[in-house]
Amino acid sequence: MFGSKFQLNEQSISVIQEIGSHMPGGFFIYKAEEPEELLYANQAVFEIFGCADLEEFKELTGYTFRGMLHPEDYQAVHESINQQIAKSKEKMDYAEYRIIRKDGAVRWVDDYGHYVETDAYGGIYTVFISDITEKR
């Protein structure tokens, strides 16, 4: 599954879903190309956003990376991620940004991302997020 290109496909997505369901924090995967559509998000991501399930999360965010971020933060975060990936041999990035939960509450998250090329989807980001509001 791992190598110079990540073999992300329907079979590996089922493995990722199983692993993701047991992770202690938020984990999601999205396409690097616009509209930055999500390919996967675990239950912990839904909970960070105050959503009960995938359907609520899709309704809230449009199931895109842009839809996950506070509108005022998107451009700066997007540019920062692109700059970090361009400079990083490991294709890693870090960002802090605001989100708007389903109940309207604004929260801060930290985001550790990794850019990977895949055969099935082209460039993707795998991302871990956690709510850091109480630490700010």
Regions inferred by a protein language model and the residue ranges of each:
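PAS and related sensory helical modules
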Residues: L39, F46-G67, Y74-E79
